[in-house]
Amino acid sequence: MVLSDKRVSRHHARLDYREGSLIITDLGSLNGTQVNRAIIEPNVPHPLEPGDTVSIGRFTLTLRMAPLSSHIDKILVETPHETELQVPDLGGRDSLTIGRGPDNDIVIAHPMVSGSHARITRRSHDGDHIIEDLGSTNGTFVNGELVVGPLPLHRDDVIYVGPYKVVYIPEALKAVDESDNLRLDALRLNKVVGKGKNLLKDITLAIQPREFISIVGVSGAGKSTLLDALSGFRPANEGQVLVNNTNLYSNFNLYRTQLGYVPQKNIIHMELTVYEALDYSARLRLPADTTPVERKQRVTDVLDTLRLTECKDRVIRNLSGGEQRRVSIGAELLAQPGLLFLDEATSGLDPGSERQMMHLLRNLADQGHTILLVTHATTNVLLCDQVVFLAKGGCLAYYGPPQEALNYFGVEAFDDIYDKLQGEKTPEAWAEQYRQSEQYRKFVVERLPQKYGAAFQLPTPPSIANPGASLQHISAWRQFVILSRRNINILRRDKASALLMLLIAPLIGLLFFAFWSPGIFEADGGDAMRAVIVLFNVSVICFLVGGLISMREIVKEADIYRRERIVTLKILPYVLSKVWVAGIIALYSAAVFILFMKLAGAWPPLNQVLAVYVTLTLTLMAGMMTGLFISAVSPNPNVSPLLLLLIMVPQIIFGGVMPVKYFGSTGQAIGYATTTKWAFESMVTISGMGECVADDICRQEKCSGLNVLYVCDFPGVRPENEPQNEQEAQEAVLQAENKIENMDENWGQAFNINVFAHWGVLLFIMATMLGLVIASLKLKDRR
């Protein structure tokens, strides 16, 4: 008996007739079997009595005893290949609404459909119908084109709302549910990169709805490349991929919400609990009008499906490898995709966990998902409907049922196929042998759509749509709020990182006691050279601390970002959710640094505290924005410190502590591009150490003659002992004037700059880095 329901497992239950009685046994199904509304224990025979009801999925069977027939045929209880929905006619209606909400004329109960999604309206002047999108999250499409305004409808136009297809017939509609009936066809895929290297060689596949497909092969065979090409996330540059006979590459946005993709690395934050991770994913992926109750129910359903309910409150990093992979799958199942692609989902799992994962994927396929899995493990490959074997270089060596693969290759174990593919023939020879085989005819040619069947004439490959093409999803502000909450929650959970962020400023502040002492800015006993070096050190420290704090913020979650970006994520709210947290840390760190300056050097005085605080905060923020840029361009977290070091070198050399006169025009130009130059010069002017020198340009008033000893307040100009005669006074004056002249020649440009203008430059640097971060992330969309 075949029950066509996605909640029914592939082998769900068994009925046995023994000694005049019927006995039912649940075969370890995913969603269980109920007898008289009570779930029976799996793998334990349960006797049935006349009148008992058996509930499996949405089907309820009632036992009625009748005379035993001599033969029982196989019974097929199924819905059509595409489930046709009952929809009202347009006749006599001025408008008809489509959406998830119960008050719509056509109710589509799917998580990716908005509450009020679209409306069909009759025009008063000619009676024709138009369709308009009602601000839905995932868009309304007509014949594959996004509806951006009122659009006239014509006979046989196909309207797509989520996974539902509505065909317009004047005065009538025909609606079909494709959510659990998505087929995938690949037609002569080739992926040419670099200098003509082809990673996929003329691969053609025909995958039917609800099939579980494994893609296996030797290392370097192009398994992940094939998966990416089939999913459309990194398209092949020759050939086509069809979803229900519609070109995926040129209609990517049409099927975007129906594609689930789980990369090799987990796409979840390890610091969150299972429920929190799925809840944040649901907030970002589900329509903006999804209520908290609906969101909670969707998360709960996914937890139940993946058998994660018992560990929903556990932190993900404390789960086993298999459980972590299930959470990653759960993030994709929230959108209830019809196609699910998994890259090495069983990699690194122990045999028991690997077997459980394969059974889980088998059950998901039985529930209506078409699943493609890249894997090295072949132990449980018999659970798959079809298996793809790739030879080295992207050659298709076999596609068909796993049970037939052993005979096809003439081996006794699946692992032996790897040796055959690498030893007996060239990859091209294996591909040619398969094209001449019965399996190729039966499982490729005959299963392809009729127009691509035996004749196999393909049209010119169409233009490829960019998977990052824009669609209006959740508003930028809403995404910013969700991401900010998630970042705060991650920090709260990751106590070690949060503690380090809070301690880095006071720990570095302790170093101030090593190079700072009270009175270095005073005319009596001060030291102008030391003051300059101290102020420069503080500028460098602020920039470095900012960079260290943020240099891994983006790259550490690159896989999560990449997946969320494909689905819903906007770049600006994502970056700003990082920036404002960095701003809070900058405000805190600047305050801590000023506290330690006060303790170590009794500086700055009260009237300079605010200006110094603003300068330090801006410098920290400029460093943090630079760190975010480093994080955005780094290929992996290990590269980030090296890039920060590369940027720090010119900040130190050309930032101002070495006099400008030692540099040529190139060095001076580099100096203008550094953050430390503008921070350092601001600090020098704010300190007032050279104010009297800047005011006395001609050295005729405060800073010349005897006035330099008694009126000028330049640090360290006054002798330790009062001159006792005219000769000592002249010597003291000469020393003071020489000191001032030397300092003025080397750093005089910093004695009286426009602090507000320098703050403006620091803000400009921050804005520039923000732009570079956004540009870097946009550039990654094209890869």
Regions found by a protein language model. Name each.
Residues 270-287:
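Q-loop/switch helix immediately C-terminal to the Walker
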Residues 231:
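Helix-to-loop junction immediately C-terminal to a conserved catalytic motif
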Residues 1-58, 88-163:
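Forkhead-associated
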Residues 64, 121, 127-130, 137-138, ...:
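Topological signature of polytopic alpha-helical transporters
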